[in-house]
Amino acid sequence: MELNDFCIATIITALIILCETLSLLLHPGLELSRKRTNTIGSLGLKPHAWKPALWDLNTIDNMELKHLLGDLCMNPRHTRWIAPLLILGDAVLCALIIWRVPYTEIDWTTYMQQVSLYLSGERDYTLIKGSTGPLVYPAAHVYIYSILYYLTDEGRDILLAQILFAIPYLATLAVVMSCYRQAGAPPFLLLPLVLSKRLHSIFVLRLFNDGFAALAMWIAIFLFQKKKWTAGVVVWSTGVAIKMTLLLLAPAIAVVLVLSLSLQPSIQLGALAVLIQILLGIPFLSHNTAGYIARSFELTRQFMFKWTVNWRFVGEELFLSRKFSLALLALHIALLGLFATRVWLKPSGSKLPSFVQQLLQRRYRTVSLSRTFIMRTMLSSLAIGLLCARSLHYQFFAYLAWATPFLLWQTGFHPIVVYAVCMAQEWAWNIYPSTNGSSLVVILSLAVQVIGILWNANGRQIPENSPKEHVQ
């Protein structure tokens, strides 16, 4: 794929200069030096008197420069050193944001009030409340914020809390880039990962629990890419116990496990995931089982229209109607079925009925899944769930933002389209309060990702035995 001037327009100047310097230092420059020497000699000058400037770009042929930039943008080999530079730059950006941008109070005080009740001995979930409402997240959320409660002087040291939240942000970013590298993604996809205003806000300005859930999600994806099935299930289930949004990955995880391990081991890992939920919830389950399940995994929760980011353009009456809710549920199920038959089961070489029959008759032969396929399957399941969700709030961007560049790349779109959709999506999620136009863009950007993956069912595969650095 030719990037041409697109690379020049999208890669920041400092990164380009650094890349050129490293390329000139690390690649053999003898041929270029001979050409320069011959040119100088033809002008009657002494070769030793010529001292080329390191940054003199005029001495580099335009085609050579474009090739250099194209290689920088498209060759996964460069991810190894570009990613750490971007993470370092983002760490500086986080520090500047914490220093210069005021903290926004939304749920932090409520979280601290709820945790205070828990630490005081309350174990009935229905009685744990704060100033903005009852506790509606599973047990791991309570444990994490209990630690933060102690570290931040009962929630009063906001600056320290922001610094602590920068740690999971940068950790998640590092894991995300590792997942991209494992999948053989080109370096031009890395830049959008560090430029999201909304992501920085979710983590270090609003202190939402979605940051910890997103970290668990990406660690699980990384472990699945490494074929660490048990560890991946444990981390994913722990993430579900922080926020149940991670249940959107469950269909993809089931497919990946069954394809890789067959039916019985997959059922055992599913039981392990359930067991983790029980173990984490024991302090609350033992006091009020129904209350804990109803509050922490409330699937029938009625969302308020004024906070929705995605479906505002349909109007409040339709948004709140049961028919609309059922239609989205039907669409969700239909898309999962379509993806299972057309995309996710492709490695098995079987249609869905035949695949199920082989599993039940224990005749199914497991397959080795590529890291690219595993990541695409899990993130497409996430995108389907977000597209069909009746209400998305701003903090849900913590799950979507880092998935979008990879999904758009997997659709086969040109890099310009990838960047355009990322920019449109970022714009829409930064409009507050949401408008009919911004919510429409949110839905369209998700639809582009889902339909694009469905249309290009094979995606972009990187062979597992490839000699390239990124899969070693």
From Swiss-Prot:
The keyword ATP-binding does not apply. Its EC number is 2.4.1.258. The keyword Transferase applies. Residues 27-80, 153-157, 223-238, 286-323, 390-395, 458-472 are cytoplasmic. It is found in: Endoplasmic reticulum membrane. It catalyses: an alpha-D-Man-(1->2)-alpha-D-Man-(1->2)-alpha-D-Man-(1->3)-[alpha-D-Man-(1->6)]-beta-D-Man-(1->4)-beta-D-GlcNAc-(1->4)-alpha-D-GlcNAc-diphospho-di-trans,poly-cis-dolichol + a di-trans,poly-cis-dolichyl beta-D-mannosyl phosphate = an alpha-D-Man-(1->2)-alpha-D-Man-(1->2)-alpha-D-Man-(1->3)-[alpha-D-Man-(1->3)-alpha-D-Man-(1->6)]-beta-D-Man-(1->4)-beta-D-GlcNAc-(1->4)-alpha-D-GlcNAc-diphospho-di-trans,poly-cis-dolichol + a di-trans,poly-cis-dolichyl phosphate + H(+). The chain crosses the membrane at residues 6-26, 81-101, 132-152, 158-178, 202-222, 239-259, 265-285, 324-344, 372-389, 396-416, 437-457. Its main location: endoplasmic reticulum. Keywords: Endoplasmic reticulum, Glycosyltransferase, Membrane, Transferase, Transmembrane, Transmembrane helix. InterPro entries: Glycosyltransferase_ALG3 (IPR007873). One of its GO terms (molecular function) is dol-P-Man:Man(5)GlcNAc(2)-PP-Dol alpha-1,3-mannosyltransferase activity. GO terms for cellular component: endoplasmic reticulum membrane. Residues 1-5, 102-131, 179-201, 260-264, 345-371, 417-436 are lumenal. Belongs to the glycosyltransferase ALG3 family. This is Dol-P-Man:Man(5)GlcNAc(2)-PP-Dol alpha-1,3-mannosyltransferase.
